[in-house]
Structure formats: C-alpha cells, structure tokens
C-alpha cells in the first residue's frame, strides 16, 4: 500500500494518478517502452481462454498440469518440503509463515529456485503481457503458509480490499495444499476488476494511488448469487487474478494453507522491489526469450 503524504500532496497525487492510470495513457504513454504486440505470441486455446476470463471476470482458474504437464508440481512441492524447517513468521502479517520471498534481479535464483523459474515460464509471461498490455516486471515471488486463527476477527488482507496503484494488476497464485472453506480460500467478486464493464467494477473504487478496504457489511449488501467466487480447490490449482478487483483470502479458521504468489506489475510501479532499478528497453521487443530476461529484472 502506498504510504500516505500530507493533504496537499495527496490532492496532487489523486489528480496525477487519475490521468496516469487512464487506460490509454497508461498503456500508450506511461508504459510505451514496454508495449508488445499480442499477435507475436503463439496461439494457444487455453491461454486465450484464461486471458478472456481475466478481461471479463478478473479471475481464471486452471490445474497446473493442464498448462505445464503432470510433473511440474513435483519440483515445487519438493522445495517446500525441504524448507519446512526454515519457516519464519511474516513481519507484517502474523498469520503468515514465509518459506521465502524473492525480488528481482533474480540472477542468483534463476538456476536454483524452482518458483522463480515457474513464474518466469513463457506461458505466464504471455498471459501477463497480453492482459496488462505491456511487458510487466515480475515484482515479487512469495511462498507462504497460512496459520489457522480460529475465531479471531479477519485482519489486513483477510478483509475485502482492492490492491493499490494500478487499474490492472496481475497476481498468479498456486495452491500447494488442498484448500477448503476452513483453509482461508482466495475469494473474489467476479467482474470487480476496474477495467471490466460490470457494476462491481465501479463499486468501492480504489483511491489511487492507494487501494481501498470497504466495510464487509456494505460489500455483502450488494452481493448477489453468482458474484462471489470462493476458490476452494485441490493442490495444484493455479488462480490468475486482477487484484485491483475486490478480493480477500487467508482467513484460515481450521486448516493450514500453503500458497505461492507471483506478482506482475508495471516497471513504472511507484513501489519497486528493494534496490531495483528498472531496465530501459529500447525499441520493440518481439522474442519471448528477451521478454523473459526483461521481466526477471536482469
């Protein structure tokens, strides 16, 4: 969440971000160096289906084996098992235990970390680039275990919220354990992504560059059957989501949840990873190998 400034600065920032985040300005001016033609990507029916679902609903789900084959999950779950003794409590959200949080540049991790390799897969980069409209930065890779909190009240990201800064944000979640209602499933209001055309796209809008945490009772007041997607699903489920839409998750009451997250954003994101300086891209990028290098921050 972007840090708040003085009232005068906040007023200026509001005006600035209204212009900056207009869809045409954001893609064609702010991120013009990073534009890439979607037509350059190979045609894949499943990838097209995911992109279309993101555009219409803000969310899509698929089993990891459908995208990457039956063996992809093995290396990821093996890594998690090896790190089980090294878990650390998250400094900001005490209901999380961290297996690892990784930021670019990923030079040291590319050959040794299966999750960094996973989130730099070409199919993910095709989806992220096509949905966002420009070559994104893989901002963060997180692997976390959610601790059951019993009857404690939801806090932080367990509450309904929209992420800050962008009108389009892509996060790709991977369930590394079976997730039921007691495990704190990722929950999304379908069609609440700001660039969709449904009524939820305009309810409880972001206060750019900040997000928003609307009152749960007000959200429930407007919720109709079919609006809510509670992503209860087996291990190996991938969730693609525009988290500028209304969502919550991690409110585990009975069972642990293990989940990886890849966060794709603009190189112009106002809160870059620690110590990162965006690489300047000259001209049109047309090869996915080059896209992969750029997205990794190397």
Q: How should each PLM-predicted stretch be described?
A:
Residues 2-14, 18, 25-29, 36, ...:
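Non-heme Fe(II)/2-oxoglutarate
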Residues 5-158:
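Non-heme Fe(II)-dependent double-stranded beta-helix
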Residues 34, 182-245:
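Double-stranded beta-helix
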Residues 165-181, 232-233, 240, 263-266:
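Short, conserved beta-strand element in jelly-roll/cupin
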